[in-house]
From Swiss-Prot:
Organism taxonomic ancestry: Viruses, Riboviria, Orthornavirae, Negarnaviricota, Haploviricotina
Protein name stated in the entry: Phosphoprotein
Quaternary data: Homotetramer. Interacts (via multimerization domain) with polymerase L; this interaction forms the polymerase L-P complex. Interacts (via N-terminus) with N0 (via Ncore); this interaction allows P to chaperon N0 to avoid N polymerization before encapsidation. Interacts (via C-terminus) with N-RNA template; this interaction positions the polymerase on the template for both transcription and replication. Interacts with host ISG15; this interaction disrupts the activity of the N0-P complex.
Keyword Calcium appears in the UniProt entry: no
Annotated organism of origin: Peste-des-petits-ruminants virus
Annotated region described as Disordered, given as residue ranges: 33-84, 131-236, 256-281
Length: 509
């Protein structure tokens, strides 16, 4: 049904635009209608209009020329447009015809429906009976936007036994003049038309076309305002306006911002509604009914205002206390962060101290295993080493039992330390080490750390091979020298080979 309505609305608007663009002459229209009516005789054949035969008579559901004649029906097989000529005495203007495409050419009874769905009996068979609405000439090309609200055809009762195809054909079979029959509906009329369509089973009734109202200008419209005058328990009086909210969604109503400033710190607001848990508690009537729920302001006593002021003050104090606690917590957290840093530094110091303790323990272990040759005291008189002469150059380093190793390295025994202080001791004498403990002089004929002296030993040959391999000579020279070394026999030849090798290496850069 909605598609059919949209189709007819679009067709009507197209006709209106075309007529506005090129309006025909009224005299020409009158002449055409008179000539068309004169061409129809009671006994003649109804000839379709040639101007509309190509476009308007292609479908059964589109408007056609009326048929006026006697009761006899004549069949015209030559007509290629699907029309069968009839003559009928009871033809009336304003009725819509239904084409019966049955194969039987005999006369039979059928029904003709008007735009309102009224059933008309008594007419005989006419496959292409078309009844014209026959509007006045002055109203034929009337504009669609300024069309009359009183339609010529009203929606009649719906026949349950009526074929939907016939109903659709009668609704669509309007002429151009019928498309211009537009009624402007707004507000409650739209709702009534929709309800009537629903109650009639959703069928489209011809004769009225809905017209969507224009969108109102929101910028120029002003919301309704109510004056508010509420005391604030002080000398000043708050005056302003509250605007009715047009929105029905949400649980919080809009409150305008106050333009007045109060010197008081605390002030109660009476225009704000109480909080709601859901939108149903404050949702008013829908906008379709045209009414909006208005805000109600509860009446409160002065004691209640004072109680609310006290609660507000206490809430402010609680919020200030919570903010102070929050700041204190931040300070504590910063201190804890610094403590964590100090803990890390302390752990590092402890590790360093433990390393130093390990080093000191290692040094003490080495010192405990060393016997330092220093003069000592507390020797026994009977000890043969007690008469060893003192060396003035020796000084005690660590307070240990000194002088224990002197008897082992000195020729003379230690001096008796138990002598009286009056006895003079020869301090100029120096102790001498034993020959067995003295180092032997360096032998220049043998290999030492000072110089390498080749011998007829395999170790000497290994040393010479290492010298050749580690040199910067070419590989061929190295191989040649190694072959010569293998051929050398005896210590004398080996010494000569070593001298030659030393001279060659000295010449290398």
């Amino acid at each position: 049904m909605a598609e059919e309505q949209a189709y007819h609305v679009n067709k009507g608007l197209e006709c209106i635009k075309s007529l506005k663009a090129s309006p025909p002459d009224l005299s020409t229209i009158k002449d055409a209608l008179e000539s068309w009516r004169e061409g129809l005789s009671p006994s003649g054949r109804a000839t379709p209009n040639p101007d509309t035969s190509e476009g308007d008579h292609q479908n059964i559901n589109q408007s056609c020329s009326p048929a006026i004649g006697s009761d006899k029906v004549d069949m015209s097989p030559e007509d290629n447009l699907g029309f069968r000529e009839i003559t009928c005495n009871d033809s009336e203007a304003g009725l819509g015809g239904v084409l019966d495409k049955g194969s039987n050419s005999q006369v039979q009874r059928y029904y003709v429906y008007s735009h309102g769905g009224e059933e008309i009996e008594g007419l005989e068979d006419a496959d292409s009976l078309v009844v014209q609405a026959n509007p006045p000439v002055t109203d034929t090309f009337n504009g669609g936007e300024d069309g009359s609200d009183d339609s010529d055809v009203d929606s009649g009762p719906d026949d349950p036994g009526r074929d939907p195809l016939y109903d659709r054909g009668s609704a669509a079979g309007n002429d151009v003049s019928r498309s211009t029959d537009v009624e402007k509906l707004e507000g409650d009329d739209i709702q009534e038309v929709l309800n009537s369509q629903k109650s009639k089973g959703g069928r489209f009734q011809g004769g009225k076309i809905l017209r969507v109202p224009e969108i109102p200008d929101v910028k120029n419209s002003r919301p309704s305002a109510q004056s508010i005058k509420k005391g604030t328990d002080g000398n000043s009086v708050l005056s302003g306006t509250v605007t009715e909210c047009s929105s029905i969604s949400g649980a919080t109503q809009a409150v305008p911002e106050s333009r007045w400033e109060s010197s008081e710190r605390n002030a109660s607001v009476g225009s704000v509604p109480k909080s709601a848990r859901s939108a149903k508690t404050i949702q008013g009537l829908t906008q379709e009914s045209g009414t909006i729920a208005s805000l109600t302001q509860p009446k409160e006593n002065d004691s209640e205002f004072e109680y609310e002021d006290d609660l507000f003050t206490e809430m402010q104090e609680i919020r200030a206390s919570i903010a102070k606690i929050h700041d204190d917590n931040k300070t504590i957290l910063s201190k804890l962060d610094s403590l964590l840093l100090l803990k890390g530094e302390i752990d590092t110091i402890k590790k360093q101290i433990s390393k130093q303790n390990i080093s000191i323990s290692t040094i003490e272990g080495h010192l405990s295993s060393i016997m330092i040759a220093i003069p000592g005291f507390g020797k026994d008189i009977k000890d043969p080493t007690s008469e060893v002469e003192l060396n003035p150059d020796l000084r005690p380093i660590i307070s240990r039992d000194s002088g224990r190793a002197l008897a082992e390295v000195l020729k003379k025994p230690a001096v008796d330390r138990s002598q009286k202080s009056g006895i003079k001791v020869n301090s100029g004498s120096k102790g001498q080490l034993l020959k067995d403990l003295q180092l032997k002089p360096v032998d220049k004929q043998a290999s030492s750390a000072i110089e390498f002296v080749p011998s007829d030993h395999e170790s000497s040959r290994s040393v010479i091979r290492s010298i050749i391999k580690s040199s910067k000579l070419n590989i061929d020279h190295k191989d040649y020298l190694l072959d010569l070394l293998n051929d050398v026999k005896g210590s004398k030849d080996l010494k000569e080979f070593h001298k030659m090798l030393t001279a060659i290496l000295a010449k290398q850069p």
